[in-house]
């Protein structure tokens, strides 16, 4: 059996009736011979310019004598503009029909909030305008509902990669597919924090050296 097992899921597992599934996962790990721990992490605390909360189950095999894992990253929060400062800001699908609501919508608020404030029927507008100085809200597969902080348009693929902490050279068959995949993914820098803690605290492995070795192999 692996020395360490890691699983993740949405924050909703900690709310209401869904808590029962969390207990089932923890119990199953124990049945399989592991000591599980539960962590709720925010991607923004892990160096990702995105506020995305995920539940991580991290379990070590019972025969491995190690102390409980300490996992509480406190990275400085990175705003959207800082993360995308050298990205071509002119690209991205424009939203000419949204101009009125985009200009009147405050950062991190939705068009629905604006329509309500104007006394208009809210309709089905749920688009959110990002803030230049704050991390992005949680990005999902439906990125069409998130608009740029400075321009009335959708985020382009390069911006989505930056806000998801994916490398600039991460390619997909099409930009649309790439944006969908990133919206459905746990940010790499977030999982890196978990991997680093496990390697250094439980496996006695220098994560930085391991990461550098892997990068060198990828460039050979």
Language-model regions, residue ranges each:
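C-terminal target-recognition/interaction regions appended to catalytic cores
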Residues: 94-220
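Class I S-adenosyl-L-methionine
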Residues: 1-129
């Amino acid at each position: 059996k692996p020395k360490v097992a890691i699983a993740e899921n949405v924050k909703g597992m900690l709310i209401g009736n869904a808590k029962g599934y969390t207990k089932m996962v923890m119990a199953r790990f124990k049945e399989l011979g592991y000591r599980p721990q539960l962590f709720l992490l925010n991607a923004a605390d892990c160096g990702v310019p995105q506020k995305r909360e995920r539940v991580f189950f991290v379990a070590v095999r019972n025969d491995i004598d190690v102390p409980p894992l300490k996992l509480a990253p406190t990275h400085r929060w990175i705003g959207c503009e800082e993360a995308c400062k050298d990205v071509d800001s002119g690209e991205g699908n424009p939203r000419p029909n949204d101009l009125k609501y985009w200009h009147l919508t405050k950062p991190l608020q939705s068009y629905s909030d604006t329509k309500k404030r104007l006394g208009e029927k809210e309709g089905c507008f749920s688009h959110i305008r990002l803030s230049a100085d704050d991390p992005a809200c949680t990005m999902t597969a439906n990125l069409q509902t998130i608009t740029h902080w400075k321009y009335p348009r959708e985020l382009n693929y390069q911006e989505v990669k930056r806000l998801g902490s994916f490398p600039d050279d991460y390619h997909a068959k099409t930009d649309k597919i790439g944006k969908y995949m990133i919206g459905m993914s746990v940010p790499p820098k977030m999982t890196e924090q978990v991997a680093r803690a496990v390697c250094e605290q439980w496996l006695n492995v220098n994560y930085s050296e391991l990461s550098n070795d892997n990068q060198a192999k990828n460039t050979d």
